[in-house]
Structure formats: structure tokens, C-alpha cells
Amino acid sequence: MRLVFITGATGFIGQRLINAVNGEFRVLSRVEHPNYKTIVCDLESEVIPDQALNNVSTVFHLAGFSHDLRDASKISDLYYKVNVSATVQLAELAVKSGVKKFVFVSSIKAGGNPSLGSCLSETDQVEPEGIYGKTKREAELKLLEIGKESGMHVSII
């Protein structure tokens, strides 16, 4: 049986994804969940265990560091560590584990905010907004590179 692996399962999108998954899944979380198969890991400070992606066919990477009331310039390393380094670490582990699909939920901040009443298109100039947007954009670019080099299917939402 191939599993679905979900990071960010406790968030708004993650909770809905869990309800929509038809089949077995495993989550990565800072705390053990009584109702889910859980890999306990804090993306701010830990290495994702190698066995986390055993028998996984698809990864949904929803976790990220986004909202903080502190001055972003004083914690930019935390944004980078969670949004870029942990994402790359997870994608590289996915390749090593034979994962076929990697779905990354990014942010509108990675492309910049369109003017009111308009939408961004794939041909628009990318202008990430703030440290959050910059780190999400960097993660997108690194994931595309990993996917191209490895053959793993990468989708960015």
C-alpha cells in the first residue's frame, strides 16, 4: 500500500486535505496525533527522519513559517530554515525514497501581489513580497530544479 504524506496537517488546508484523502496517510507534526500515523519532527530545529517517507507515493508539503509578530528582519534565518531548507530536505528525501509526486503549497507572496482587480499570470514578472515571499519563491525554484534533475513530478500551488 502506498501512502500519502502530509506536512502542515493541523493547518486550515491540511485539515481539509486529510478529510479528502481516500486511503492511508501519514503526517509530519511537532506533536503526536492520536488519530493519525505521525512522524514527530519540528521543521525549525530537526532533521526529517529517513523512514518518514517509507512506502509514500505522494507528498503534500503544506507546512511553512509565515506569520510572526516579531520583526521579520530579526528572524529571517527562521523563515529560511523552515521555508527553504526544510522544503529542500523533504524533497531530497522524497527522491531518495522513490516518491513519485511532490505537491508544494506556496503563497501569492512568492509572486507578488497583483493590483486590485487583476490576477497574476505565468508571464508576469515575479516580485516576491517580504522575507516570507522571498523564501517561498526560493523554495519553488529549488523544487523545480530537484524535480527536473530527478524526474520526480513537482506541482506548485
Region locations from a protein language model:
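NAD(P)H-binding glycine-rich loop region in Rossmannoid oxidoreductase-like domains
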Residues: L43-V82, L93-K96, G111
